Each structure stands twice: as structure tokens, then as C-alpha cells.
Regions:
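Glycine- and acidic residue-enriched flexible segments with recurrent GG/GxG motifs
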Residues: 1-201
Length: 201
């Protein structure tokens, strides 16, 4: 439940609140982005969905189990991903997308270490810029990873990847993930849930 509702012709950041399931309120920073938001990713909360696939090389392995733990929204919709790779191995969950060369694309997702031994380990996200990886250092709390890249080709795969040769932590890593989003924008925009099609809100 919002404290207030209003409209304006620009963007701003303000403090909002929402009701907690066990009573009371939690407060958070919210951005009142004016305009439609299109999440280009499909199955933004289900990484077993048909538009996501595994990409493996060398000794890489990946396992995805859906709806295993509470999401940042306090619903049982976050997935568990287990990846294992060493050396030149690659273990990734990917989705193929179209893009316009030179345009910015912003990607975001929520991550959390699944086990105590995974806290502090690093996984990677590769977005629209080929060869550019963003580090995600896992915590025992939900953290949102945000990044913006310019597209280097007319198509790319968004990779949630374990690739030690590019800086992820060698060996097995298990983490929770929820709320992946890609927008054709120069900044990360408010989250929009998707299923089997891109959604605009």
C-alpha cells in the first residue's frame, strides 16, 4: 500500500512503503518513472521457462530448480541455480535477444547466496556488450544487480554465467535468483514481471 499516489512529468526518487505479510510496514526507495516499461526478457521469475537454456563448455554444469525459496516480494517464486566450472569451463543460463547496435540496454536481477559457503563468491552477468562481464558478489541477503551496456551487435544472449577465466569464483556455486529484467533504456527501470512474452506496463 502506497503512502500516496501522484503524477508528475519527470522522474524522482522518494520514500514509499508496503505492507508486510506479518503486519506493519517496510520502507524503501522507489522511483516514479513516468512512461511505459517493457521487460524484454521472458519468464522473468522462472529460469526453467522455455526461453531460458543452458550454455556449457569444458567441465561446466548447471542445474535450475524453480520456486524453491521466498523472493524479495515474500512469495515462493525465487529459483535455485547451481553452477560448477573450473579453468576454462563455462556454466551459464542464457536467453537470446534482439538489439539495435549502439543503443543502451539495462539489465537487473536479484541474487542471494543459497548456502553459507556461497557467501562472497562471484558470478557474472553478460548483457548487450559482447565480452563485457559484470561481477555479482553473493550475499546472505537479497541484492539487486544493475548494469547498462551498449549493444555491440543486432543480437546477443543475456548470460547469467559462471566463467572462472572471466572472474567468477572457481568451483561449485549455488544461488537464488529472482526478477530478471532487460529494458531498452540508459538506466534500470521499475521491475515488470513476464511469462512467455515480453510485457509493457
Amino acid at each position: 500500500e502506497d503512502i500516496f499516489t501522484y503524477t508528475r512529468a519527470s522522474s524522482a526518487t522518494f520514500t514509499n512503503r508496503r505492507a508486510k505479510k506479518n503486519g506493519g510496514y517496510e520502507y524503501f526507495l522507489d522511483t516514479d518513472y513516468v512512461g511505459n516499461v517493457t521487460n524484454l526478457l521472458k519468464y522473468s521469475e522462472d529460469f526453467t521457462g522455455s526461453d531460458w537454456s543452458s550454455s556449457l563448455s569444458g567441465d561446466g554444469s548447471v542445474s535450475v530448480i524453480s520456486n524453491t525459496t521466498l523472493s524479495p516480494n515474500n512469495d515462493m517464486t525465487a529459483d535455485t541455480i547451481t553452477v560448477n566450472a573450473t579453468g576454462l569451463g563455462i556454466a551459464a543460463v542464457v536467453q537470446s535477444l534482439s538489439s539495435t547496435v549502439g543503443n543502451p540496454y539495462s539489465v537487473s536481477a536479484y541474487f542471494k547466496a543459497a548456502r553459507p559457503q556461497d557467501v562472497g563468491k562471484t558470478i557474472l552477468i553478460r548483457g548487450a556488450a559482447s565480452g563485457t562481464y559484470v561481477n555479482v558478489v553473493l550475499s546472505d541477503n537479497w541484492l539487486k544487480s544493475n548494469s547498462t551496456q551498449q549493444a555491440s551487435s543486432s543480437s546477443f544472449t543475456l548470460d547469467i554465467t559462471h566463467r572462472p577465466s572471466q572472474g567468477s569464483t572457481s568451483g561449485e556455486i549455488q544461488f537464488y535468483i529472482w526478477g530478471a529484467q532487460l529494458t531498452a533504456s540508459a538506466k534500470v527501470l521499475p521491475y515488470v514481471k513476464t511469462l512467455d512474452v515480453a510485457v509493457t506496463k
